[in-house]
């Protein structure tokens, strides 16, 4: 069973994390997105530990109360800081120089792509759920049909000054309905709300969007073995962006489209995600 641990990277930053598996075993770092939390990986953390890995799924900057700089200072939430956090947590877990496996969903996927671009020598494998390679995403955004732009319009809504109030109003009705409509089980929704269902956490989570940084910035060609998982019912990422990701990976690459699965695949289809993830990691050992 996963346990809740604290990971301190600097005197000012202590992250909550779901962990399982023996320290020193091959490391798998799992990065969540919005509007979920580290709890989206609970099934993967358990399965990875059972398979002999050390799995660490942190509550990232702003989501962990001990790692929540002032969200009004958006520089503290730039993607470079989020990348720094990930690498610092790897070191704090006892893997300062070792290669490790990286998994990301949504915003965590954006960080994962950027880390694979910057530190390919540190990664044994890359697995991304939902979020396509940024270059494929940008290309789809620019198409005249406007499909991907429509799917991404929530990014603009999250920049509004009252966005946190809107999302949390009426017992977080928007958030509950958003997750439920995407097939997230009720018990998982409550876990995510235990992290995000307060104004301090929500303002910090939305600061990621306000900082923007490299979420849409171009990256290089990825040279890390990559598994990309996309649900064909994902309302935030269209097929053009998803299928176009292959153009930006120059390493062993596997694209898996999950029929009927939405944006939150780890919560909606945990067994299938576990199966694909374990196959990928076994094929590319650290």
Predicted regions and their residues:
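Short strand-coil-strand connectors
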Residues: 10-11, 32
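Short acidic/polar mixed-charge low-complexity motifs
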Residues: 11-14, 25
């Amino acid at each position: 069973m996963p346990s809740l641990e604290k990971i301190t990277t600097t005197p000012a930053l202590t992250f909550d994390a779901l962990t399982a598996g023996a320290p020193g075993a091959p490391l798998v770092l799992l990065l969540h997105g919005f509007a979920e939390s580290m709890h989206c990986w609970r099934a993967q953390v358990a399965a990875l530990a059972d398979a002999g890995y050390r799995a660490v799924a942190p509550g990232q900057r702003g989501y962990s109360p001990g790692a929540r700089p002032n969200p009004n200072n958006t520089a503290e939430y730039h993607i470079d800081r989020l990348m720094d956090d990930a690498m610092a947590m790897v070191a704090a877990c006892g893997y300062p120089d070792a290669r490790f496996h990286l998994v990301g969903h949504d915003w965590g996927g954006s960080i994962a792509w950027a880390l694979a671009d910057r530190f390919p020598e540190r990664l044994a494998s890359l697995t991304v759920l939902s979020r396509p390679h940024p270059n494929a995403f940008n290309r789809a955004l620019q198409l005249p049909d406007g499909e991907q732009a429509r799917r991404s319009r929530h990014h603009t809504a999250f920049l509004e000054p009252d966005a946190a109030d809107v999302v949390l109003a009426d017992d977080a009705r928007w958030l509950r309905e958003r997750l439920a409509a995407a097939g997230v089980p009720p018990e998982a929704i409550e876990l995510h709300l235990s992290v995000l269902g307060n104004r301090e956490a929500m303002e910090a989570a939305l600061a990621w969007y306000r900082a923007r940084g490299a979420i849409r910035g171009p990256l290089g060609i990825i040279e890390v073995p990559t598994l990309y998982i996309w649900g064909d019912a994902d309302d935030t990422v269209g097929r053009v962006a998803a299928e176009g990701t292959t153009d930006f990976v120059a390493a062993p690459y596997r694209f898996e489209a999950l029929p009927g699965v939405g944006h939150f695949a780890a919560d909606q289809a945990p067994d299938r995600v576990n199966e694909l993830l374990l196959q990928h990691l076994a094929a590319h050992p650290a």
